[in-house]
């Protein structure tokens, strides 16, 4: 109804924090939770069939760590994009791919980024706006819960599971009935909430952040409409407040509102210096040293702040997998690169009597 692409919310954190228990109340809206809860432990083809079976409903997948990390990134795209593989028919003709629309919930001890990193793969920005990582630590030392209602966290988790297995299935019918009878109200509510959520972002927010804000606005809109439908008995202001809080926590965890590629550039350059700061950078004040092999650049500690001077070859290595030019612009924008006017490289006089153009990175990048 609102034209928003599919997406998933991924609860990640240590074992026994209530991640799986959080799936049960959500699933109980649609039916018996144990019958509707699925595992990530499946092939991409298997999950395609599972997604199709949950078209226009909720899909819940437990334990992301059980899916092959080689397939995890592609599966994330597939689930959110709502389209399976294009296949050939019995006689070689093209078969139409399976299509669906859904929001999915996911749990796991690791994020999608960490899961892909376990085999040396880098998460893509498009995957991170389709699978939105949310910490299972609510900050109250009770896992996913921020209040226990007089119980300890473990008992509350068990209570939610038990109640969800006893009372289930009826709310979805009331919800769908309300939506079909009041479909004209849906988009105006969403547009108003969307406008408020986008207005809450800093002006410099990247499009990726705005897309995720739009998805949280959709969730908040669903909550407000469910209250109007008397499906939920919650204070209206609590719905928007909760969704805005999660959006802000997501922004905080990702490191800000800049594009993911720009943040990745800063992380990679910082990591490169941390790993190779002494072994591949020659101290400028002591002159040439044959001890440095595969030199990436020089260290200049003669000024008020330390500078790591990258040769273009060293810069390309430090920003491998990214655009070196875009990475330089990202560090310039963050204040970590000393430019020559608008140019990211500047000429530097070196002890070996050369004066090459180099990328001059401030040592303060290691402090943040």
Map each language-model feature to its residues.
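P-loop NTPase catalytic core of nucleic-acid-dependent motor ATPases
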Residues: 1-33, 216
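Conserved beta-strand scaffold positions in the cores of enzyme catalytic domains, especially
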Residues: 8, 34-35, 104, 128-133
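Long, charged, glycine-rich C-terminal linkers/tails
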Residues: 8-13, 36-45, 288-291
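Short glycine-rich substrate-engagement loop in P-loop NTPases that contacts/grips substrate
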Residues: 23-58
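Extended alpha-helical interface modules used as scaffolds for assembling large macromolecular complexes
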Residues: 51-54, 67, 74-89, 108-368
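Loop/turn-to-beta-strand initiation segments
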Residues: 55-58, 99-104
């Amino acid at each position: 109804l609102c034209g928003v692409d599919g997406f998933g919310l991924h609860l990640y954190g240590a074992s026994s924090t209530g991640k799986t228990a959080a799936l049960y109340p959500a699933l109980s809206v649609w039916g018996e939770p144990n019958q509707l809860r699925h595992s990530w432990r499946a092939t991409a083809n298997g999950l395609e069939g599972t997604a199709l079976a949950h078209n226009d409903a909720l899909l819940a997948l437990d334990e992301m760590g059980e899916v092959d990390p080689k397939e995890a990134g592609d599966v994330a795209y597939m689930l959110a994009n709502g389209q399976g593989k294009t296949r050939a028919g019995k006689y070689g003709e093209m078969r139409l791919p399976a299509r669906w629309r859904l929001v999915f919930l996911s749990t796991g001890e690791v994020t999608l980024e960490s899961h892909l990193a376990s085999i040396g793969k880098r998460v893509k920005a498009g995957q991170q706006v389709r699978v939105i990582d949310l910490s299972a630590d609510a900050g109250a030392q009770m896992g996913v819960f921020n209040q226990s209602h007089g119980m300890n966290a473990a008992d509350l988790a068990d209570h939610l599971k038990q109640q969800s297995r006893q009372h289930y299935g009826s709310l979805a019918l009331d919800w769908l009935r309300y939506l079909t009878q009041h479909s004209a109200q849906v988009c105006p509510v969403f547009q108003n909430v969307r406008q408020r959520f986008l207005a809450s972002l800093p002006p410099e927010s990247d499009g990726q952040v705005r897309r995720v804000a739009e998805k949280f606005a959709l969730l908040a809109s669903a909550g407000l409409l469910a209250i109007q439908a008397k499906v939920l008995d919650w204070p209206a202001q609590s719905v928007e407040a909760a969704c805005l809080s999660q959006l802000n926590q997501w922004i905080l965890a990702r490191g800000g509102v800049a594009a993911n590629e720009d943040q990745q550039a800063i992380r990679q350059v910082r990591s490169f210096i941390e790993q190779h700061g002494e072994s591949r950078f020659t101290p400028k004040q002591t002159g040439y040293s044959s001890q440095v092999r595969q030199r990436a650049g020089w260290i200049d500690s003669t000024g008020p702040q330390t500078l790591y001077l990258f040769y273009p070859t060293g810069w390309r290595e430090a920003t491998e997998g990214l655009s070196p030019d875009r990475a330089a612009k990202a560090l310039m924008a963050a204040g970590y690169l000393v430019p020559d006017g608008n140019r990211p490289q500047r000429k530097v006089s070196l002890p070996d009597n050369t004066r090459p153009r180099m990328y001059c990175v401030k040592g303060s990048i290691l402090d943040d």
